[in-house]
């Protein structure tokens, strides 16, 4: 065994060294140099400084401008809510613990931080699944003529929360557990031990299959079909240029959001899977800490992509920031509205 299992923690270092201490009570500077903990704190502070304003601004701008309250935008707002949850209840805790060099808030604080981080990440993932399915239904039209309405959007949002809770809640009630990971400054599900009291193995398999592989496969399938349909429609010139442009813009935005999520979370999922299937193998604290902390950057990807690629939202945001005046002077009426993209008619291939 190349690690040390204790009460609600696992340290990736053998206790034969005599250095291992509880991550809830002592600084973990034997795992990494103090400057590395400070660097993680600086990184978390950076994410807090960008993540909270940009996600909060997304919520405020959508609330202030009625024209943005379109069904598709409700899902995007749900992504901003997920990002805000991660910033407020996850990043602040991790910033504080990284400064101290250990998880100073104890097992209860670890469970709360792990739950919030998992919940926010899962809401983001399942929101992207809903967006992918919406794009597939609207563009590929497997159900014929279909309009994505507010009722569909709210049902999709409810679905994302149910799926997210079904992943994040079990470790709170005894199916697996949340423990410090990497450099012991942030918490996640227990991939590290086979503790029979918590049935870790069955939970990790459930999480990987139902809450990563299945949603990612769904996203790839829907976008594979979507790309084929859009290419076929463009080749046949079945739709007007403006309609095709609107579909391409919305689809490109959602695809970039998906890619952003995968870039942020795939390294973490891959390392967690390696640890799970190679229990007892030696690995450094940084081996898990780097992808774990990098995955947190997903909270700022989606709103940045949304602002950059959605001209209507960008104009509304500038109007809000500059007290009713857009310094760029862009005409919002020139922007293709979200509602138009929802009712467009791209014939199936």
UniProtKB/Swiss-Prot annotation:
Entry keyword annotation includes Protein transport: no
Protein origin, superkingdom: Eukaryota
Ranges of Low complexity composition bias in the record: 334-349
One Gene Ontology cellular component: photoreceptor outer segment
Glycosylation: residue positions: 2, 15, 200
Membrane-crossing residue ranges in chain numbering: 37-61, 74-99, 114-133, 153-176, 203-230, 253-276, 285-309
Main location as per UniProt: membrane
GO molecular function, one term: G protein-coupled photoreceptor activity
Record-level GO BP terms: cellular response to light stimulus; G protein-coupled receptor signaling pathway; phototransduction; visual perception
Keyword Aminoacyl-tRNA synthetase: no
Residue numbers on the Extracellular membrane side: 1-36, 100-113, 177-202, 277-284
Protein role: Visual pigments are the light-absorbing molecules that mediate vision. They consist of an apoprotein, opsin, covalently linked to cis-retinal.
Family under the similarity heading: Belongs to the G-protein coupled receptor 1 family. Opsin subfamily.
Protein name: Green-sensitive opsin-3
Species, as recorded: Danio rerio
Gene behind the chain: opn1mw3
